[in-house]
Regions:
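ASCE P-loop NTPase helicase motor core
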Residues: 27, 31, 36, 40-228
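Short, conserved phosphate/pyrophosphate- and ester-handling motifs at nucleotide-, phospho-/glycolipid
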Residues: 22, 76, 270, 451
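Short, solvent-exposed amphipathic alpha-helical segments in soluble enzyme
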Residues: 88, 281-285, 474-478
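Conserved pre-motif I regulatory segment
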Residues: 2-40
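Conserved helicase motor core of P-loop NTPases
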Residues: 4-5, 29, 37, 154-159, ...
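C-terminal accessory regions
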Residues: 349, 364, 369-499
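Conserved SAM-binding loop
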Residues: 18, 72, 266
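Catalytic phosphate/metal-binding cores of nucleic-acid and nucleotide-processing enzymes, i.e., regions
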Residues: 39, 77, 333, 344, ...
Length: 499
């Protein structure tokens, strides 16, 4: 009986009549939540325009009405912000929820898996297609994010997890599919799997050229029939258009005041192309000649681990995780939601420059003192040192050789300290060795854009031929198309790819 009541509660929280797929998903969700086996997981897969966001919002509102505990998570700060806006409740990044920093033992920061002290709680993870199964980051826990997430959630206290995502998007780097959206992968953890797919495009989405073309591209993925580059339909749609290269500056200059710089993004295929666009936008659209100035948008390109200023800062209570339904003072982790203090600034986080001062050259590199605000974390402001060399390089961040050079030069300053542990402690606190590595954030690659959405997206695919067509390109194109919420501009789109 309660299973049916829960299903109807979810359906009641829709703002419009749900589709058959959404009704089926609500039924699956109610069965998942009422299963007496607490080691169960639900996978909700849905393509763009099928109402994943609406369903997730209805589930959150239902849980709130029933006074049930729920935590909203996403892989990146931007994705967490979008999830929060769409659901009306706070959301946090997966890393800030499940990891805590251990005592310093070496050169780099190391984060251990946190202990989940919650009970009777649903963890909803959006953009789960980005969660990796590969062991490629030993800084965090086991190095495998999906392993750690499962271990964290399932704590024998009746916690369970709902994974939400789109399997047509780019999978994690180095993987062919998104493991967190695969039932066989989740069963391998000893979990009972509930799963459903949303495929029916909402009626209000059918007038969208963005979603129409994204659906066509997605079908190429589903049927594995990509033998030539997809042709895009523009006729009859007001939300998708071609922008010739000689009109790009004027178009961007219109988008910035219309929807805001924070809601405008150029997406391209390489760091080299992103650098070209970033310099062009700063010089020709924004009229900025300084190397770095107030108002510049930046993207962090390497994790920065912050040494806490006092012991209590290390264990700040995570407000986004538990505070929807009351604080749990025993649950301590990296940082409080809405603040960066005591934790880390993640690769991919966005920042806006508030002040720049004291530019200088040391150790063969150039640095500046800056005040940054972080729009995905309630515009929290932080004073820190940034390294200017990464702004224009084609490499994703400082190269291994550059990092080694900086390490050796900084360590010379601490050569008079006899104990290695004490030297390493000084290095860990050194502003220059730990300077934030950033690039300009007006144009980014699609992997950096994943999980985010912007009102106006300018898409540059660069030179492509049928011979260059790969499954990865189709996933890339689908992911890029679905980053736009209001208008998608295709930059220098070839006539051969117009329907």
């Amino acid at each position: 009986m309660f299973t049916e009541e829960l299903m109807y509660d979810v359906l009641r929280h829709f703002a419009f009549n749900p589709t058959d797929d959404q009704m089926f998903a609500a039924d699956i969700f109610s069965r998942f939540m009422t299963d007496r086996d607490e080691r169960c997981v639900m996978i909700l897969r849905g393509i763009a325009g099928t109402g994943k966001t609406s369903l997730a919002g209805a589930i959150v509102r239902t849980m709130m009405d029933l006074k049930q505990k729920v935590t909203l998570l996403a892989p990146t700060g931007r994705a967490a912000k979008v999830f929060s806006q769409n659901s009306g409740q706070p959301a946090a990044t997966v890393h800030r929820c499940i990891y805590r920093e251990k005592a310093f033992t070496g050169l780099d920061g190391k984060f251990n898996l946190n202990v989940n002290l919650f009970r009777d709680r649903l963890f909803m993870v959006d953009e789960a297609s980005m969660i990796s199964l590969s062991s490629n980051n030993s800084t965090f826990g086991s190095g495998c994010l999906l392993d750690d997430l499962v271990q964290y959630v399932y704590n024998d206290r009746n916690c369970r997890m709902l994974l939400i995502g789109d399997k047509a998007q780019l999978p994690p780097v180095g993987e062919e599919e998104s493991p967190a959206l695969r039932a066989d992968v989740m069963r391998a953890y000893g979990l009972t799997v509930y799963e459903c797919d949303l495929n029916e495009v909402l009626r209000q989405s059918q007038d969208s050229g963005i979603l129409y073309n994204a659906t066509v591209i997605r079908q190429m993925i589903t049927h594995n029939e990509a033998t030539q580059l997809p042709k895009i339909r523009f006729n009859g749609f007001a939300d998708i258009s071609v922008v010739p290269g000689d009109e790009l500056i004027e178009s961007l200059a219109s988008s910035y005041p219309e929807v805001g710089m924070d809601e405008t993004m150029v997406i391209t295929r390489s760091n080299k192309r992103a650098n070209i666009f970033n310099q062009g936008i700063r010089n020709m659209v924004l009229g900025r000649e300084e190397e770095l100035t107030t108002g510049d948008m930046l993207m962090v390109v390497k994790n920065k681990y912050k040494a806490p200023h006092n012991p209590s800062e290390q264990g700040e209570v995570q407000t986004a995780v538990g505070e929807m339904t009351g604080k749990d003072p025993s649950h301590r982790n990296i940082s409080s939601f809405g603040g960066i203090a005591g934790g880390f600034i993640a690769n991919g986080d966005r920042a806006t420059v508030r002040r720049v001062r004291n530019v200088r050259e040391l150790y063969g590199f150039r640095f500046a003192d800056v005040t940054l605000s972080f729009p995905d974390y309630d515009n929290t402001e932080e004073d820190m040192v940034v390294i200017l060399d990464t702004l224009k390089t084609e490499a994703p961040a400082l190269t291994h050789e550059q990092n080694e050079q900086l390490f050796q030069r900084v360590m010379e300053d601490y050569a008079d300290i006899p104990l290695k542990a004490d030297r390493m402690k000084k290095l860990r606190e050194d502003d220059y060795y730990n300077a934030l590595q950033v690039k300009f954030g007006y144009a980014i690659t699609c992997h950096k854009a994943q999980g985010g959405q912007w009102a106006h997206v300018y898409l540059d695919q660069g030179y492509m031929t049928d011979e260059m067509l790969t499954p990865d390109y189709i996933h890339w194109l689908y992911t890029a198309f679905t980053r736009a919420t209001e208008h998608l501009y295709l930059v220098n789109w070839p006539k051969t790819q117009i329907e």
